[in-house]
Amino acid sequence: MAILVTGGAGYIGSHTCVELLNSGYEIVVLDNLSNSSAEALNRVKEITGKDLTFYEADLLDREAVDSVFAENEIEAVIHFAGLKAVGESVAIPLKYYHNNLTGTFILCEAMEKYGVKKIVFSSSATVYGVPETSPITEDFPLGATNPYGQTKLMLEQILRDLHTADNEWSVALLRYFNPFGAHPSGRIGEDPNGIPNNLMPYVAQVAVGKLEQLSVFGNDYPTKDGTGVRDYIHVVDLAEGHVKALEKVLNSTGADAYNLGTGTGYSVLEMVKAFEKVSGKEVPYRFADRRPGDIATCFADPAKAKRELGWEAKRGLEEMCADSWRWQSSNVNGYKSAE
């Protein structure tokens, strides 16, 4: 029996593949490589010394998805695949709705056809919209502020409805906060196409000299230094959370949401200073206007994941920065460095 990992060549997906292989699972990866590299999977095999099955295919291709299930004994699915840039989703909403929703429909229809009713879904803290306070618990009001977040919210509801209709379904909805860092080997890490959308890969690329300076959006928030506060979680902690969630769906039925965060918030400037300290490089920055929809403070209450999944984040800020710098400095052009 194997675990199907959609989007398994991506940033969080590739790190989760490492943890799955190291935990003894057989894995099948489906990825269209639209925002990832097959080199990541080569390195997953190198890190673990284990093999995996890879299909370069799109979830929108119903025949390709069907053949993955026909050719492999799939026991459960971890579903990462999807478009994920908030700003782009505002500019081209139809593309996001079509890709993220239709792809998941085709996946779930194949799962139903082949009797696979266990799924771990990659959701996001964006489903909380603009939370009034932090820390955020799973029962906070939901409401997305952009089409990307809206697709996550809609898919959460659709997966819950599957369980309501057929209680043999087992669904874990993982709401990530801000993934950061890289595998400690320095062999896999975050490799965004073009200019990064997220703070820390941008900081890393400034430190390594690929980008000139960082734009810090907003320095007038009601926080200790005026910059936004977020919950940054080491990507390996996040990957371990997926293995724990997989154990849960394999051994029980239900549909539950879990926050995967550290429960601690750091400001943009704290992150920049921590990265400068670890890398020994200066990260020049300038202040810019707030981005529409950004909020002052957002961090998780991860108590439910600890209680029900037996998971908690173990790696701190310094380790995140050190691992990120090791990856970025030894792979200046990401996976393209290997070509």
From Swiss-Prot:
Inducing factors: Transcription is repressed by glucose but is not influenced by galactose.
Q: In which pathway does it act?
A: Cell wall biogenesis; teichoic acid biosynthesis
Q: Which Pfam families match?
A: GDP_Man_Dehyd
* InterPro entries linked: NAD(P)-bd_dom, NAD(P)-bd_dom_sf, UDP_G4E
Instruction: For this entry, list what GO says about its biological process.
Output: cell wall organization; galactose metabolic process; monosaccharide metabolic process; teichoic acid biosynthetic process
CC cofactor: NAD(+)
* Active site as annotated: 148 (proton acceptor)
Under which main EC class is this enzyme filed? isomerase
UniProt-annotated binding residues for NAD(+)? 10-12, 31-35, 58-59, 80, 84, 152, 176
Give any GO molecular function from the UniProt entry: UDP-glucose 4-epimerase activity
Query: What keywords would UniProt list here?
Result: Carbohydrate metabolism, Cell wall biogenesis/degradation, Isomerase, NAD, Teichoic acid biosynthesis
- Residues given in the record as substrate binding sites: 124-126, 176-178, 197-199, 230, 291-294
Q: What happens when the gene is disrupted?
A: Mutant shows a greatly reduced galactosamine content, abnormal colony morphology and is devoid of UDP-N-acetylglucosamine 4-epimerase activity. Disruption of the gene can suppress the tetracycline sensitivity of the ezrA mutant.
- Which family is this sequence assigned to? Belongs to the NAD(P)-dependent epimerase/dehydratase family.
> What does this protein do, in the record's words?
Catalyzes two distinct but analogous reactions: the reversible epimerization of UDP-glucose to UDP-galactose and the reversible epimerization of UDP-N-acetylglucosamine to UDP-N-acetylgalactosamine. The enzyme is more efficient in catalyzing the interconversion between unacetylated than between corresponding N-acetylated substrates. Essential for growth in media containing either glucose or galactose. May protect the cell from the toxic effects of galactose and glucose or derivatives of both sugars. Involved in the biosynthesis of teichoic acids via the formation of UDP-N-acetylgalactosamine.
Q: What else is known?
A: It was initially assumed that galE and gneA were separate genes, coding for two different enzymes, but it was later shown that they are one and the same.
**Name assigned to this protein:** UDP-glucose 4-epimerase
